[in-house]
Design a protein with these regions (language model features):
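Short Cys/His-rich "knuckle" micro-motifs
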Residues: 76-80, 97-101, 150-154, 174-177
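Beta-hairpin (beta-strand-turn-beta-strand) motif
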Residues: 58, 92-93, 131
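Soluble extracytoplasmic domains of inner/organellar membrane proteins
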Residues: 124, 131-178
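The canonical Cys-X-X-Cys-His
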Residues: 63-72, 84-93, 140-146, 163-170, ...
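N-terminal export/targeting leaders of redox proteins
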Residues: 1-52, 56-60, 64, 68, ...
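Nucleotide phosphate-binding site architecture
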Residues: 59, 88, 134
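Primarily the internal scaffold of c-type cytochrome electron-transfer domains
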Residues: 4-6, 94-126, 171-216
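A short, flexible N-terminal coil/short beta segment enriched in small residues
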Residues: 18-22, 90-95
């Protein structure tokens, strides 16, 4: 039987198949890279706020305790945002004419809350409780990064499920003494795993990975 196609057709077919697979793989890698990029996750990207609040100045240089502003972090699922009255505790006496603080003064005069932009906004289908985490020895910087060194607040983690599960699967790598939970300069010791295992047992920490724990 006469050959219909030229021998070169075999080469073209192979190149087409391999090329298609390569392009699909390249496209998948590109999409994966985009999904992990700050452009998509907003990780390490400072959010625009009504007032350029600096954690570096307040928590770092002045040494304000996290709980001074985030008053409900130990007893509620939400850490809480400070009312304008908290800001005015200091700023009714210092930096009283600073133009960048005019929104704070206007908020106080008009008795109208500032509209802060959430930096770590979880989807509605995710349940998270701040109080249980801090009560089990999870420090602020574990999730929020070196907050006392950040001028304008940004998201330190991706907030992806994998990011949360890294800690839930091996809490001994991240847990710290309760006395150090609000210490923004805490550094894990060299024997972190040994200390972590001890604290996991002492604090009765469970490695919770069931879907219903966070997706209720």
């Amino acid at each position: 039987m006469a050959q219909i196609f030229h021998h070169s057709t075999n080469l073209i077919s192979r190149l087409s198949i391999y090329g298609g697979v390569f392009i699909l793989g390249l496209l998948g890698a590109a999409l994966y890279g985009i999904e992990l990029s700050p452009w998509y996750t907003e990780q390490n990207v400072a959010r625009q706020q009504p007032v350029p609040f600096s954690h570096k100045h307040h928590a770092g240089e002045l040494g304000l305790d996290c709980r001074y502003c985030h008053t409900s972090v130990e007893k509620s699922s939400f850490a809480g945002l400070p009312p304008t009255q908290t800001c005015m505790t200091c700023h009714s006496r210092i930096w009283t004419n600073a133009s960048m603080l005019e929104p704070v003064r206007a908020s106080y005069r008009d008795d109208k809350s500032l509209s802060w932009t959430r930096v770590n906004a979880l989807p509605d289908f995710v349940y998270f409780d701040h109080s249980i985490h801090v009560s089990k020895g999870v420090g602020c910087t574990t999730c929020h990064g070196p907050i006392a060194e950040i001028p304008l607040t940004w998201r330190a983690g991706t907030l992806y499920m994998e990011w949360c599960l890294n800690c839930h699967r091996q809490p001994e790598k991240f847990v710290r003494p309760k006395s150090e939970v609000f210490n923004p300069y805490y550094t894990p010791p060299k024997n972190q795993l040994e200390l972590g295992r001890k604290l996991v047992k002492e604090y009765k920490i469970q490695s919770l990975q069931n879907c219903s724990v966070c997706h209720r």
